[in-house]
Amino acid sequence: MEYGIVYLLTNPVMPGLVKIGMTTREDMDSRMRELYSTGVSVPFECPFACRVKKSDCAKIEKALHTAFSPQRVNANREFFRIQVEQALGIHVHIASLRISV
């Protein structure tokens, strides 16, 4: 079975913002290096990442984006003005359902 990763990222230079994203890479380090190379002044930190079926990755990411849409900073970006704990609660619940969202 193929897997993807749904993750939460924070950055000390962006307090109060959480990036909710996904990757089909095999590890988070690759994704975090890629994001750091996009002009962010310090590397992202990953307080949570969850390996899920690749076919569910985008669905789970979309469900999280929808759940936090009122707190979305920019419609074209995956950053939300929320606490990590808020995203963790919903993320863990959605990921544990083992059903298509």
Question: How would you describe each model-predicted region?
Answer:
Residues M1-V101:
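Non-catalytic accessory segments flanking enzymatic or RNA/DNA-binding domains
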